[in-house]
Regions:
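Helical-face signature of the major facilitator-like transporter fold
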Residues: 12-16, 122, 156, 164-168, ...
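Residue-level signature of mid-helix packing/kink "hotspots" within the transmembrane helices
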Residues: 24, 122-130, 180, 214-215
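Extracellular/periplasmic helix-loop-helix junction of adjacent transmembrane segments
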Residues: 27-126
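Conserved MFS/SLC helix-loop-helix module at the cytosolic interface between two early adjacent transmembrane helices
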Residues: 127-163
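Helix-breaking motifs and short loop linkers at transmembrane-helix boundaries and internal kinks
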Residues: 140, 161-166, 178, 195
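Cytoplasmic helix-loop-helix junction between adjacent transmembrane helices
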Residues: 171-208
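A gly/Pro-rich, aromatic-decorated transmembrane alpha-helix motif that marks the paired
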Residues: 208-220
Length: 221
């Protein structure tokens, strides 16, 4: 097929963008500041908060409710509207951060846990890059890419079953094992499909896709 090598590099660029979206999800959703408009009792669109003595009932746009003591919330005015800000995210959803911690203690705990997860992810990622290079040489790029994508796809699915720091770290390590393969795999693929005078361009497109994934991750997530 004429020009098939360019279709191949486009597909590799696509999975590379997805790769970096996957990688960034935990970082951007680990702890998030969610704004709630203080309501006078009327249901409003979007997130809103109802005062209940010393607590606020936080109502998400999807109807989910959460009761939080007012001391745990940040109150401010935005565009002439009173709002409260609640810290949420994966770390809180998994119960990894105690609600009794102060804001400074909670921030430190969240940072330390994310750092631990990232370290183990990168250990798995580095080991996989060494092993994947040999694997792709042995079984070829088609099978190699298939194994890598299946592995990190399974890691993504299993991450939804995480129930604590240990399981989440394990699934992130699995993600690292799967995500690392395309780097040596792309180098091999470019050598197989592109003439020598076009290989630098192909490799540059691959690198640009990695940067693009990092750029759009915070926008999409």
């Amino acid at each position: 097929i004429k020009g098939i090598r360019w279709w191949i590099i486009v597909l590799i660029m696509l999975i590379t963008i997805i790769n970096y979206l996957d990688r960034g999800t935990l970082n951007y959703m680990w702890v998030t500041n969610i704004e709630y408009v203080i309501s006078d009792g009327q249901t409003t669109s979007g997130n809103y908060a109802l005062k209940d003595n010393d607590n606020y009932i936080l109502v998400k746009s999807n109807g989910d409710r959460l009761t939080v003591h007012e001391s745990k919330l940040i109150s401010k005015e935005k565009n002439g509207v009173d709002i409260v800000i609640n810290k949420e995210g994966i770390a809180y959803d998994l119960g990894l951060i105690s609600p009794d911690l102060s804001e400074e203690e909670a921030a430190k705990a969240a940072k330390d846990m994310l750092g631990t997860i990232t370290i183990f992810f990168m250990i798995a990622y580095g080991i996989s890059q060494l092993v994947s290079g040999k694997l792709y040489d042995k079984i070829g790029t088609r099978k190699g890419f298939s194994i890598s994508v299946l592995l990190w796809g399974a890691a993504d699915a299993l991450t939804s079953l995480s129930c604590g720091l240990f399981s989440l770290t394990g699934f992130r390590m699995m993600l690292g094992l799967g995500e690392a393969g395309p780097w040596p795999g792309t180098t091999k693929s470019n050598a197989e499909w592109f003439p020598q005078k076009e290989r630098a361009l192909a490799q540059g497109l691959f690198g640009a896709a990695a940067s693009l994934g990092s750029i759009i991750a915070p926008i999409i997530i």
